[in-house]
Swiss-Prot record:
Homohexameric ring arranged as a trimer of dimers. One of its GO terms (biological process) is tRNA processing. This is Ribonuclease PH. Phosphate binds at residues 87, 125-127. PANTHER family: EXOSOME COMPLEX COMPONENT, EXOSOME COMPLEX COMPONENT RRP41. Keywords: Nucleotidyltransferase, RNA-binding, rRNA processing, Transferase, tRNA processing, tRNA-binding.
Length: 238
């Protein structure tokens, strides 16, 4: 039986997207990113200096932290204190890698950009929403450095965006929500630049393997969705 999307979307249709800039007062960049019912607060803090292993090399650094608030899901999640779960570590590394691909660290100078992605409400796609919102917040943080005379030009060299694609019953669905995510035979997360460059592909078969032809279709669908997300990012920055 063919899968019918619970919210009535077409297979190639994204959820409703919103980027609310300057959501909080103090970070250099602060964006509430929303994809459907998923909400992630993405902030960027600027710190002088770099990790010890980069000191004296004349370049900056960007790193990310990711957490889910206890009330982000129907059942309360315990806060992660001393030990992070493998999932949390994987996601925050993905966010950091993705955002570093967007920026020329040599043009940043010896300063560190700290990305914090806090999930307020989770309905699948939290890691991709975090990447998308963090890129918008990063733009605001860099604009602040330029306005303060700390930088003369932006080190951001490309826009980046991310989206998930699920295979359910052999058919690909763009930007799945939670009911679709739990039904997926294959779950893929794709991060791309604004010229179609691939930054990261995460693809996992939950039960049966998937074919190269299906992977190509997944990437085509992801590229289509990412182009729309990047347009929404740029619109939010106007």
């Amino acid at each position: 039986m063919a899968w019918i999307r619970p919210d009535g979307r077409r297979p190639d249709q994204l959820r409703a997207i919103a980027f609310q800039r300057r959501f909080t007062q103090f970070p250099a960049g602060s964006v509430l990113a929303q994809f459907g019912q998923t909400q992630v607060l993405c902030t960027v803090t600027i710190q002088a200096g770099v990790p010890r292993w980069l000191t004296g090399q004349g370049q900056g650094w960007l790193t990310a932290e990711y957490r889910m608030l206890p009330g982000a899901t129907p059942d309360r999640q315990s806060r992660e204190w001393l030990k992070l779960s493998g999932r949390t570590q994987e996601i925050q590394r993905l966010i950091g890698r993705s955002l570093r691909a967007a920026i020329d660290l040599k043009k940043l100078g010896e300063r560190t950009l700290l990305i914090d992605a806090d999930v307020l409400q989770a309905d699948a796609g939290t890691r991709t929403t975090a990447i998308n919102g963090s890129w918008v917040a990063l733009q605001d943080a860099i604009a602040q450095l330029i306005a303060q005379g700390e930088l003369t030009e932006s080190p951001i060299q490309r826009s980046i965006a991310a989206v998930s694609v699920a295979l359910i019953g052999g058919e690909a669905f763009l930007d799945p929500d939670y009911p679709e995510d739990v039904q997926a035979d294959v779950d893929c997360n794709v991060v791309m630049g604004d010229r179609g460059e691939l930054i990261e592909i995460q693809g996992t078969a939950e039960a049966n393997p998937f074919s190269r032809t299906q992977l190509n279709h997944i990437l085509d669908l992801a590229e289509q969705g990412i182009a729309q997300i990047q347009a929404a990012q740029l619109e939010a920055l106007r």
